């Protein structure tokens, strides 16, 4: 025992090392557990959403939005080395963070699946989660990385591909 029993570890208490929930896994499954429309229900076709940067937290919103508009949502897979390697040729700078570099592979994956409409908005301001929050803006990379994708993934120059990357502030209900 620790002298004086002032340390909560010293009096014989042990942490429960079993049954510890993996909250990251729980959140990930909750965010990405939506089932897209079947092709016959998706009268407007498919929309591709890359599983990158700000699209993690906002995916439930965008999935619901496009599903209500009768699009079949195609989500890129979980990031891995193969996804990274798919987009490596279009990465313009080594100075970007790794999550941003992954975005190139996710968009390329969607294109290789035959998705002709890809939606990847630029979000400078996120929604206010609680009133005490004094700022809720994304870093400059997250805010505008879709512009980088648009200008560096050559396949997006194909006139049959629609790449939408509007600048939207989720704090403004008008947008």
How should each PLM-predicted stretch be described?
Residues 1-175:
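An N-terminal assembly and electron-transfer interface module characteristic of large anaerobic redox
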């Amino acid at each position: 025992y620790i002298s004086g029993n002032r340390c909560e570890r010293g009096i014989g208490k042990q942490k429960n090392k079993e049954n510890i929930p993996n909250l990251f896994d729980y959140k990930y499954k909750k965010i990405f557990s939506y089932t897209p429309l079947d092709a016959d229900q998706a009268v407007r076709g498919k929309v591709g959403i890359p599983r990158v940067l700000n699209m993690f937290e906002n995916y439930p919103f965008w999935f619901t939005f496009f599903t209500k508009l009768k699009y079949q949502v195609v989500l890129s897979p979980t990031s891995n080395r193969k996804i990274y390697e798919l987009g490596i040729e279009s990465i313009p700078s080594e100075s970007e963070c790794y999550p941003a570099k992954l975005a190139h592979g996710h968009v390329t994956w969607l294109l290789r699946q035959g998705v002709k409409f890809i939606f990847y908005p630029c979000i400078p301001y996120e929604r206010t989660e609680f009133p005490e929050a004094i700022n809720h803006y994304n870093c400059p990379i997250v805010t505008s990385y879709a512009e980088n994708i648009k200008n560096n993934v050559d396949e997006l120059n194909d006139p049959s591909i629609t790449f939408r990357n509007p600048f939207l502030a989720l704090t403004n209900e008008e947008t």
